[in-house]
Amino acid sequence: MYKRQAQQQGRLGREIATLEELKNLLGLEKMPEYIESYDISHTFGADNVAGMVVFHNGRPMKSAYKRFAIKGFDGQNDVGSMQEVLTRRFNHYYNDEDGSTFKILPDLILLDGGEPQVRAVLPVVASMGLNVPVFGMVKDSKHRTRAIAVGNGEIEINSHRQVFTLVSCLLYTSPSPRD
């Protein structure tokens, strides 16, 4: 029993250390305990959906995962779809009943995409009167996470092993359009 508790405490310590490293790397004011990640998916330009993945204290919070059917666009429009989804998500924040996971304001938003997605979503968040940091997750030619996109550049994360693993998990655990 003590061994199991020690293992759990060790894992929790690593998760907190990873979140602290992510905070420092991104220049955040506070540790991002509640992170939301968004990814747009489509099937040959149709059936557009967005997945929202939530990590709380460095662990997946599957009960808060959401899928959004994209209603405003036919065909592939990742930037417009991100704007739509974040608008709908934060409308839920303001309008849902207490107890909804939408009533929790994230400490950090990570988007699948680079600077175009970040630049498109920042005004949406600001227009809603919210102050939530937004960054993108940039992939390499092999579709692996390579960097985090900031407003006008990128932060390489390959040398930050634990942060790299966390960000990769956020990106690749997105709910599938067929879930």
Q: Locations of the language-model features?
A:
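Acidic, glycine-enriched active-site microenvironments
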Residues: 3-174
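A short, hydrophobic C-terminal helix/tail in secreted or cell-surface proteins
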Residues: 175-179
